[in-house]
Amino acid sequence: MGNVPAKEGRSRSSTFSGTGAEIVTRSARRNTTSSADVKKSSRKSEEKDRLREKHWRDLVVRLHENVDGGYLAPYGTYKSNLDFDTEVVRRLVINRQLAPFYTPLNDFDPTWTTEELLVILSQLPLHSIEDAYSDAESEEDDVDNHKIHKSNNYYRRQEQKRKLKHSMETAKQAQKEEETALLHQKMLLKQGGQVSSSLPSKDLLLRLYSDASECPICFLYYPSNLNISRCCLQPICTECFVQIKRLDPHPPHDDASNQPNGDSLPHTLISEPAHCPYCAMADFGVIYDPLSDLRTGINGKCSPGEYRMPEHSDAKSDVQSVKKRPRRKSMAATDPGIITVDNIRPDWEQKLISAKNKLARKAAAASAIHASNLILNGDDSQTSSQQSRLRSRNSGGQTYNTIEERMIEEALRLSLLDEEERRRKERENSSKD
């Protein structure tokens, strides 16, 4: 049996070969998984950038995107909180379920003559560029700017700021081009030339602004057919409505962890519904009654430039008849036709889940650090006798096992949360498709 290796030699050689193959296999698997994760992260980042660019493009007021004398994008009264779903809002305005973004007047006097009113209206821009973008170029000071060693999160934040600034600059430039086109159309109108049918006619402007109403929140004047709050029936312009949203996820107000330096549990986070700015009723929503005889622009009967007021009619009397329509009763948030704050920000549930997951990961990291400190403290402790050392070793082992079990349970719980979020995203994507 000279050439046959001994039993011990065969087992060791086989074990070594098997172990080496397993190491190579694991290494290849890790490399494949790492490459797949990088590609997935890259696709996710590209999709996020694409959605951000689209969001800012949708915030540009365009002359041809006209609905009943208003537009699909805000005028620029506010500089912040433009994080509503622009695609949802545009669809609601086109379907006449939400009042369009009308160009506001800073003041209104019912004694103005028709000529005086038309002069003021002819000077209005599409968008208040300087007010809306005045703070866009000023950057907030990052907490890590003055540190010698920058964290990875710092460079990630700087990259996000750079992309956001680029999106804002692109939108600002596009808005300037729209303003230039509007001025060109107004010049052609004065010279008696052929103008675009998207330029509102004098009849349309007088029909809308002859008896303008004040929005009680921004104190600007708009056409009288504004949105009405579902609860207390107060008018509110769309520019103000899209500013209202839920509070960020937070612990309940009666929770002790809501105090400063309190430790919040992930499952206790809540997202409170938005309240009416007038009567403070929860689940704020509005209803909009479009003028039946005024359908111009997108999905309308005629273009804005082709609108003509019926003969023997007066703009002020027509608007006053609108104001005298039968008064509605308060309606529930779930009634048909009610547009709530959650309708224009449908991602509030996702934000709540993300906040809970983030807090859970933070708690898990804190638990791991605490556990490692306990283990190190246990290793450093010494006793005077062999018996006490044995008791300490046994106690330390039990503590280690208990901590390890808790960490495993926490990891499993986080894994289940991530899997639930992944499945929910897949369902949303499949429903969109």
From Swiss-Prot:
Its main location: cytoplasm. Residues 377-395 have a biased composition (Low complexity). One of its GO terms (cellular component) is cytoplasm. PANTHER family: PROTEIN SIP5. May negatively regulate the SNF1 kinase. Residues 37-49, 308-317 have a biased composition (Basic and acidic residues). It is found in: Cytoplasm. Belongs to the SIP5 family. InterPro entries: Sip5/DA2 (IPR039301). Residues 1-49, 305-334, 377-404 are annotated as: Disordered. This is Protein SIP5. The gene is SIP5. One of its GO terms (biological process) is cellular response to glucose starvation.
